[in-house]
């Protein structure tokens, strides 16, 4: 009985197990996903599946966060990356819905023999007596395809050797800045009004000689954001890479380094960049010694045929009587506060020479040609307004002479000049030394524009000390003509001044004087103090036995009879 009951239980359990297995199998065979049963039903499982898919990684580097508010929302941008090392690319590349492409622009290595002094030689053969001056090549990238069409340029600027106490003359730094400028200009070639942003990365920022502070949008730490003016930038690229050559103006094609610049396809002359508001400017401060010189300068500009505005900056040392004469000569007068040279000695000749920095505050003009008040202009030089800042004649070594300069007034530049004037040293304690450390990249003007009345090297001059007839401007060093008798150059009378003496050059200043209106000549008269000095120098020349025997000359200068009372 017990065995029968156990067998019955076993059969029942097996039947129950089979029944359950068949039911489970039926359910499994008839199961369908919900979204297949009814695709119109909004199933949470679909949303969950979509959000679980991996998204592309978005990269928003610092530079993009700084400029994205300036970029158009609807446009996809192409980014040009310059001087970014391969192992740093991931840190600067951007991605996302607004990024079309990251383009890496490579730089060719600089030649080993390319130095700053080879770009800025002491002297060039302007007259082509022995050879035609040429410039060494600064390799720039060849822009092709998408490389020549970017909306943003991101560039790491080299700052090795940077110091707040001096200018940075570095060829690699120049190459990087010129390459950035070239990339911007090429990108805007099809649309001159196009906006291209440049983000410079580096503590020293870009070269202000190429990228102006007026074009700076913002700065955050080592990031400098610029929106450059493409027309101005293009003009910079049309200039030689240094003072190794003078750029021709208004004569056929402008200077172009055609090996690596696509700009050669355009016959663009620099004269097309002439600014609308231009003027000549000079400065008088601390005394009235140069009042006559400034009047003669103004008259020489007018005698050359120029009708451009003439601005004279002056401090309180210039009397009302003198201001009347200066105004009659053609100067528009503006009063300024003089600026002391931080590194000059008290009561030295250059103690207040930094007052020249005030010319950058004349911001109602686009471009100025500054001329020292001891100059005369011999030929029309209005063409200078076609040159960019900073253009000047060479002085020595890699330096320019600040006696004549083409500059572009700017409030932010003046502020920067003032800020750095207390940090950057000056080799001569004056404005010229400081400006040469601030503007290390400059453009050479012809020596004919700023010919100095200096004859230190007798082997380079004839015995008569004549200057060439094709001069454009003469810089009167030494004792000034109006402080001598017109009969001869009184620089001959002093041993230390004889290097500045020349009868013919002295006479050229008096030709300008002779053409002045009579009412202006009185401002160039002799006073008692001046005459005593001249007579003292004549006696010294006699004691020294100088062979020219100028002390024997009978003075006929009419100013001697009509001596000024003061």
Curated annotation (Swiss-Prot):
Residue ranges crossing the lipid bilayer per the database entry: 17-37
UniProt superkingdom: Eukaryota
Subcellular location: Golgi apparatus membrane
Positions of substrate binding: 372-374, 401-403, 428-432, 475-480
Membrane topology designation: Single-pass type II membrane protein
UniProt KW Ubl conjugation keyword: no
Record GO terms (molecular function): glycosyltransferase activity; metal ion binding
Feature type site, description Important for catalytic activity: 356
UniProt-recorded name of the protein: Putative UDP-glucuronate:xylan alpha-glucuronosyltransferase 5
